[in-house]
């Protein structure tokens, strides 16, 4: 499935992975992951970011996300992750564009 990976001080990029927890954990760099549901996507991140003193990556709805995080599609029927559509990729690539985030946004809303 195609996902977006957003790393600290980097532009978002598309990555193709298997639809399994191990693939997500490997990217996040942590065995424990947190999943937040937002409309048509899921935000996957490291819940220990504050405890591990990871740098703030982006702000989402006022929440400081620390460390690398992932955006996946949301398969509501199956209650599972799914790949992002081309439209979703475009939308979230623009939303988390580093230059946009740095220049004039402190908080992105999903």
Labelled PLM ranges:
Residues 29-30:
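A glycine-biased structural micro-motif
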Residues 37-41, 45-74:
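Acidic, low-complexity, intrinsically disordered interaction modules
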Residues 1-19:
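N-terminal low-complexity, intrinsically disordered segments
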Residues 17-24, 58-61:
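A short, sequence-level motif marking secondary-structure junctions
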Residues 67-95:
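Short, compact, well-ordered microdomains
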Residues 106-110:
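Non-Sec secretion/translocation targeting segments of pathogen effectors
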Residues 96, 100-103:
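Short, flexible helical or helix-coil boundary motifs
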Residues 10-14, 50-54, 77-82:
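Short, surface-exposed beta-strand/loop "edge" segments at domain boundaries and coil↔beta transitions
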């Amino acid at each position: 499935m195609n996902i977006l990976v957003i790393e600290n001080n980097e532009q978002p990029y598309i990555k193709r992975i298997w639809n399994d927890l191990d693939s997500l954990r490997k990217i996040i760099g942590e065995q424990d992951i947190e999943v937040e549901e937002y409309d048509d996507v899921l935000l996957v991140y490291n819940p220990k970011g504050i405890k591990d003193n990871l740098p703030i990556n982006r702000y989402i709805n006022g929440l400081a996300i620390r460390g690398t995080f992932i955006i996946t599609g949301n398969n509501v029927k199956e209650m599972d992750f799914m790949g992002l559509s081309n439209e979703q990729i475009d939308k979230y690539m623009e939303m988390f564009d580093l230059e946009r985030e740095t220049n004039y946004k402190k908080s992105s809303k999903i």
